[in-house]
């Protein structure tokens, strides 16, 4: 267990992974540790055959293929660390392939659904202004909820309409917002936020009714409430506005590298999942480009 604790500390101090990510790694690696302990095998002495047996064990749990892939990714990282620290000579998990799985396209909102959601907040109230700004920022910038809650007043450049956000791995990036978001931002900062602040000293942009900054859970609850009041039948996950941002940007001509940077993805392959297009667009492209499609 000492090696596991050292690895988790490495993820925290050197890699700057979030607490949630580290907990996920810990669960996956401890599961591995307990499996081999039950077989009386030391985790630093496993063989290729042992790794194959462990893969069979994961399949026996009847969990989905994405979860198995995630667990294998955690374990590979752990053994790569052990190789680097010269605790083991070879990472046999690098020889294990992830299970093949069907790639599911991210769900996104259509324009009419967005309009319904944006109409819910009452802009005559401080909380309504704040809630509308939450929607505007998530859709206008594509940031994660975890990044949204950490926005401070001094990270916003209202002149250039940019925000400095802290993403995964403590990496900073600049995101841009448009004029519609700007109007709500100005309204909230000048009016709603001042009322919520109640003479408190708080640098965070988004506040609750007591003048304290919001948590990610609070944001999700706000989005759930807006979704119910909007009458949208589909369940709106908090990531769906991020998916919609990426989809709309690409569908309207943005290049994938720019969208990758705005989303804070390390690898363009992660962004490429958003390059799907709607059936309506396929039809429009066909009708406008194919000579036999025109009347």
PLM regions: where:
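Conserved catalytic core of the tyrosine transesterase superfamily
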Residues: 1-295
